[in-house]
C-alpha cells in the first residue's frame, strides 16, 4: 500500500472581469515573463475589438472559436518493431481545448499586423467563421488522423 496521499485536482481560477475559466486559460497562455497585467490588457482589448467589429457578446464569439478549433483526434508517434507509426488517438475535451488555445495564439502571433490585441481579435473572429491559420492546423491534424486510421489498433 502506498504511503503517499492522493493529489487533489487543481481547480482552474476565474478571471476578475468576466469570471470565466476559459478567459483565464487564454490569459495564462498569452503570459510572457510573468507580466500577467499586460496579458490581461492584451486580451481584454482584443475582446473590445471583437465587440466593436461583430456587435455581439465577445465571450460567445470566443466560445464559438474555441469550439470550432477543438480537435477530436490527434496523432501520436508509436514505435512498433523498428518502424514509427503515426497513431490516431481520441483526446479528452480539456486537452483539446488546451490545444485549440495554443493553436489560436500561435497563429495570431505569426499573423501580420500592428499589435497583439489586434492580431488576436482577428484570429478569434476568423476561427469563429471557420477561417484562418488555426482552423487550417486543426484540419491538417484531422486529415493526418484520417489517413493513418489503419494504425489505430496500435494504441
Swiss-Prot record:
The entry's keywords: Chloroplast, Plastid, Ribonucleoprotein, Ribosomal protein, RNA-binding, rRNA-binding
Classification via InterPro entries: Ribosomal_uS7, Ribosomal_uS7_bac/org-type, Ribosomal_uS7_CS, Ribosomal_uS7_dom, Ribosomal_uS7_dom_sf
PROSITE patterns per record: RIBOSOMAL_S7
Subcellular location: Plastid, Chloroplast
Ligase keyword on record: no
Pfam name, any one: Ribosomal_S7
Lineage: superkingdom: Eukaryota
Alphabetized GO MF terms: rRNA binding; structural constituent of ribosome
Function, as annotated: One of the primary rRNA binding proteins, it binds directly to 16S rRNA where it nucleates assembly of the head domain of the 30S subunit.
Subunit (UniProt): Part of the 30S ribosomal subunit.
Protein name: Small ribosomal subunit protein uS7c
Organism of derivation: Metasequoia glyptostroboides (Dawn redwood)
Lineage: Eukaryota, Viridiplantae, Streptophyta, Embryophyta, Tracheophyta
Gene name, Swiss-Prot/TrEMBL: rps7
Amino acid at each position: 500500500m502506498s504511503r503517499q496521499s492522493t493529489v487533489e485536482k487543481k481547480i482552474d481560477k476565474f478571471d476578475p472581469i468576466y469570471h470565466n475559466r476559459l478567459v483565464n486559460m487564454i490569459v495564462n497562455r498569452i503570459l510572457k515573463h510573468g507580466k500577467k497585467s499586460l496579458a490581461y490588457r492584451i486580451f481584454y482589448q482584443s475582446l473590445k475589438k471583437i465587440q466593436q467589429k461583430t456587435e455581439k457578446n465577445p465571450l460567445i464569439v470566443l466560445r464559438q472559436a474555441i469550439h470550432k478549433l477543438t480537435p477530436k483526434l490527434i496523432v501520436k508517434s508509436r514505435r512498433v518493431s523498428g518502424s514509427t507509426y503515426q497513431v490516431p488517438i481520441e483526446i479528452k475535451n480539456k486537452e483539446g481545448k488546451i490545444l485549440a488555445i495554443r493553436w489560436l495564439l500561435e497563429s495570431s502571433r505569426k499573423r501580420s499586423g500592428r499589435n497583439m490585441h489586434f492580431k488576436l481579435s482577428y484570429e478569434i473572429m476568423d476561427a469563429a467563421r471557420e477561417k484562418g491559420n488555426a482552423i487550417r492546423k486543426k484540419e491538417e491534424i484531422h486529415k493526418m488522423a484520417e489517413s493513418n486510421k489503419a494504425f489505430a489498433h496500435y494504441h
